[in-house]
Amino acid sequence: MDKRTENMLKEPIFPLLVNMSAPNTIAFLVQAVVVLTEVWLIGRLGTSALAAVALAFPVIMLTQQMAFGALGGAVSSSLARSLGAGDKQRAEELLWHALFLAACGALFFLSVFYISGELLLQILGGKGELLEQAIAYCRVFLLGAIVIWLSGTLSAALRGIGNMRFPALLIIFGSGLQVTLAGGLILGWFGLPRLGIIGAPLAAILSGIFMSSAMLIKLSYFSQEVELTLKRLSLKK
């Protein structure tokens, strides 16, 4: 029995819950600060840019909630059940299934937006320059959204195997990177090109690349509970 399992079976319940939930709580608070900071940065561009982000907000939130919530919750619980049953091989196969679903989700959202995204934003009230800015924002975000889906899936996988701290620390460091890049790419700080409103989704994508890469390396080379190896690559039922 490994130390983590022993702690879960023997430690008092309340301190155990606090210890396991604290990293995620702090990480999500940091993410909330990131959202507020990006809104402030975009607000420096003017009210039209801020309105364009508000118009694009439902598309962005739906993508993130599907990646981190719907798919992430399923991945976390399925891996936990497989490991709880002592079936490591199934857990590793499930991880590959999860990555495949993440890629499909990113492609589906991108395809739907390119087919009917402009109409959707018009229904939500977008027109003229406001609509053009919102479309540009969504296109940049969805073109790179595969890393958002991967981040949500991989962080859920790590939580499913009982590793709460690593994804939380990554979210905190990734959030710091995102804010720094957002300031540079939106407003031209730190000598970076001033891209305006599309700097925000680009910063999120670059931060997502950092986080998803770190989690892929962790699961491929430094994880004992579940290893992401090509020998488990299978899409069987």
List each language-model region with its residue ranges:
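Short alpha-helical transmembrane segments in multi-pass integral membrane proteins
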Residues: 1-21, 79-146, 180, 184, ...
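Residue-level hotspots within pore-lining transmembrane alpha-helices
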Residues: 26, 30, 34, 63, ...
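Alpha-helical transmembrane segments of multipass membrane proteins
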Residues: 36-40, 62, 111, 119, ...
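Small-residue-rich hydrophobic transmembrane alpha-helices
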Residues: 50-111, 148-167
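Short runs within selected transmembrane alpha-helices of multi-pass transporters and secretion channels
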Residues: 72, 76, 141-160, 167-175, ...
